[in-house]
């Protein structure tokens, strides 16, 4: 059986959005006859929202958080235990405090298994101003 690896954001779905409803039946059928793997920078909860639990659990394996949190269906088969060092977190907060970028919206430091997402604007921020 052939193996297929798909990125989620910007490939299967528009970035941070849900998969197209009319694409779901085709993709689910495709998963049933192929070994399908998903790879995403997002966490499991966000990926569930984007591709639906049915698609998520039908995949052979899903690599969340850039491969730092891995699932086979509902079973967590790997999770990186790395944590953001306090010194690095302080540095990021200083960068945020001293940035001249005027807009602030949303979460600036998002800790995930095995990595961290940092944004001056903030997660959930709107760049269309």
Language model features: what each stretch is:
Residues 3-5, 61, 69, 117:
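Residues embedded in well-ordered beta-strands
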Residues 11, 68, 123:
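Short glycine-rich anion-binding loops that position phosphate/pyrophosphate groups of nucleotides
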Residues 102-129:
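Conserved acidic, metal-coordinating active-site core of Asp-based
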Residues 17-108:
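Active-site phosphate-binding/coordination module
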Residues 2-19, 38:
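Asp-based phosphoryl-transfer active-site loop
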Residues 2, 88-95, 118-121:
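Generic low-polarity alpha-helical segments
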Residues 1-4, 22-25, 119-127:
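Short amphipathic alpha-helical segments, especially helix-boundary/capping motifs
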């Amino acid at each position: 059986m052939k193996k297929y690896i798909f990125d989620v954001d910007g490939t299967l779905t528009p970035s941070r959005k849900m998969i197209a409803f009319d694409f779901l039946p085709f993709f689910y059928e495709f998963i049933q006859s192929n070994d399908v793997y998903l790879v995403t920078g997002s966490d499991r909860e966000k990926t569930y929202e984007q591709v639906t639990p049915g698609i998520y659990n039908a995949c052979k394996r899903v690599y969340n958080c850039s491969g730092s949190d891995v699932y086979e269906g509902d079973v967590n088969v790997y999770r990186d235990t790395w944590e953001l060092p306090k010194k690095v977190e302080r540095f990021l907060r200083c960068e945020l405090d001293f940035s001249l970028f005027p807009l602030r919206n949303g979460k600036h430091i998002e800790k995930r298994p095995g990595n961290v997402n940092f944004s001056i604007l903030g997660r959930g921020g709107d760049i269309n101003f």
